[in-house]
Curated annotation (Swiss-Prot):
GO terms for molecular function: linoleate 13S-lipoxygenase activity; linoleate 9S-lipoxygenase activity; metal ion binding; oxidoreductase activity, acting on single donors with incorporation of molecular oxygen, incorporation of two atoms of oxygen. Residues 212-246 are annotated as: Disordered. Binds 1 Fe cation per subunit. Iron is tightly bound. This is Linoleate 9S-lipoxygenase 2. Belongs to the lipoxygenase family. The keyword Oxidoreductase applies. GO terms for cellular component: cytoplasm.
Amino acid sequence: MIGQITSGLFGGPDDSKKLKGTVVMMNKNALDFTDLAGSLTDKAFEFLGQTVSFQLISSVQGDPTNGLQGKHSNPAYLENSLFTLTPLTAGSETAFGVTFDWNEEFGVPGAFIIKNTHINEFFLKSLTLEDVPNHGKVHFVCNSWVYPSFRYKSDRIFFVNQPYLPSKTPELLRKYRENELLTLRGDGTGKREAWDRIYDYDIYNDLGNPDEGKENVRTTLGGSAEYPYPRRGRTGRPPTRTDPKSESRIPLILSLDIYVPRDERFGHLKMSDFLTYALKSIVQFILPELHALFDGTPNEFDSFEDVLRLYEGGIKLPQGPLFKALTAAIPLEMIRELLRTDGEGILRFPTPLVIKDSKTAWRTDEEFAREMLAGVNPVIISRLQEFPPKSKLDPEAYGNQNSTITAEHIEDKLDGLTVDEAMNNNKLFILNHHDVLIPYLRRINTTTTKTYASRTLLFLQDNGSLKPLAIELSLPHPDGDQFGVTSKVYTPSDQGVESSIWQLAKAYVAVNDSGVHQLISHWLNTHAVIEPFVIATNRQLSVLHPIHKLLYPHFRDTMNINAMARQILINAGGVLESTVFQSKFAMEMSAVVYKDWVFPDQALPADLVKRGVAVEDSSSPHGVRLLIEDYPYAVDGLEIWSAIKSWVSDYCSFYYGSDEEILKDNELQAWWKELREVGHGDKKNEPWWPEMERPQELIDSCTTIIWIASALHAAVNFGQYPYAGYLPNRPTVSRRFMPEPGTPEYEELKKNPDKAFLKTITAQLQTLLGVSLIEILSRHTTDEIYLGQRESPEWTKDKEPLAAFDKFGKKLTDIEKQIIQRNGDNILTNRSGPVNAPYTLLFPTSEGGLTGKGIPNSVSI
């Protein structure tokens, strides 16, 4: 469309010395929450005249005065706007004409320099030259903020959408390519400013605030053998006054301003949606708290009906002058979200999927077990390969930590099999949180948390569902760690007080699983481990590099969401510490778990085999055979994994035909070296790192990176509200131990088991805070880009990769159809379970909002 309009306006037979182009951009005001009325169409003309200049750089004609780099064209300036491309309230994009002087010797442009002498920054989306003689259309994908030139130490340069390996870069563009990478790396000094584009590394030394007292001191994560950690983005903030090794923090009110490279910040719609969801959750959070002030038992839910009131009914939106004044003060995008017509009133929480169909089915043993395969944390369960289960903790430090579960506890529930027979038939499985928690449990229980380390044994029934057999709850020995643990084993019951005790035992398991999920499965294994890949890719791979083009969409918004997490979620006293049972030990515990992180094991087939829930099988479609056939996460995940791998293989094979091409790619080798030695530097000496010497190693590594950033994150994130939005199903904290006979708590359990249950799990205030958080995290923003989609259809000029990407998209569409078909198959009982919640977390696409489906390209929330 742009081409037709520009040809009509500017083309003609007499323009042989002129080259016509179209610039698409947005100005700052279009993205300003407080001044949406100042739309681009009103402000566009600020950039006309000579405030913004463009100079093309030839890829074929050198400049003898400039070290034989590509020759620059004369400056060209924006002409009158041609048209507005998008609605005003969406952050308007406007197209401008631009005319360059051109001659035959100049040839094909390979890059351009832009200079902004205006006082404001603007967002440059693209430049398109519609008809370069003897070449046709030349397109530059920009998608970058351009600040006034005095903010930069070097020229802003953008390259054509033609990928080049370093050795195949046109000679006249080579120096520009190298210099741009130097600019993005910076020199490792100084405090970063809002306009900076520098990517650099740092350790997690900014979670605590020692200037505010000892209670706000937190362990530095990364840079030590004791607490290794992936690196984060460097901000360069000064150290704290009391500890020169800790980085100072910015005030909470300025949280949105925490530094990330400018183009890593949330876009207009993403920020608007994010703030809207936060506003809704705050309102929903405050109102029940106000109501609780007039309650006889503040900070306690008195019954399950009390809990359900969070979701049912609620306070309807008021009408009248006050409401009109409120809506007048909120930006238009926020008003649209706040006044949604999908049944989500502003003053109540949406009903979580787990209680939509039935208010009680979540309490069944079948649903408890099913969520280990199809819930929000389906990545922990493993096959039991020795009985009783043995601990891997050092016995010199922790004594005997082996399980006390015996055959007598479980053999009456094995359908006539012995334990050995059940194990040999791959019928026994375990959800094991024991070894992860025991080293910290004594300290955790000095806080308001009172909990156990759990092991749960399960039996695979003939209908494909899992049946809980026994739950072991353990505490550190009261005489010291070296004496091991004290443990008690609980078995299923549906009669009297024993039934209530069994429900509590499952709740303690859910508390364990919730904390491990949030800290390990979610934060550590997706958010934290992917950030070094974001940084290294921008520092070492030019935007011209084909692997940069492959991976870049899978890093969108990750640095920004992680930076905000450090500021308000995972920091000392932050929301995470306030809502998970690990409390102030949470992040330190995740560093200890990172010691066991192995990059190749993050590949889905490798993970399934390592957990024993699959075996290698070359005759199976994905190279592995599942031992639990109806394992929704694994079944859907393997199809997504294979689609990603096929796409990555097609793409990489187009650029690399031999080992030699991998080895001589200096950018690729520098990228991989920096990832190992700096980004994940605490693991630089691990023998499992791929050597990056063969195309297959590149394909496998990129597939794993994309899997982590897209499907793995989707599987462990977007089910949070559907399953944990109803806190009794997945409590995050337990506040007292299992009641013992002869105590008042035990008598209460007999007389009012529901109240005893609610007094044991997460308190009302923590529940509201936690539910508010996961509602935000479980939503898709309206500008989300999903797996198989790209921001620009012209992201590359190479036709074969474009065709391969189209094939990838069609494969994902086929997978969607297969997921729908499987969810409709009544034989597959684990797909929906007793709560009738079809498994859609790995359904590739979604609309915006709280949908429980959709795989965004990146860790973006």
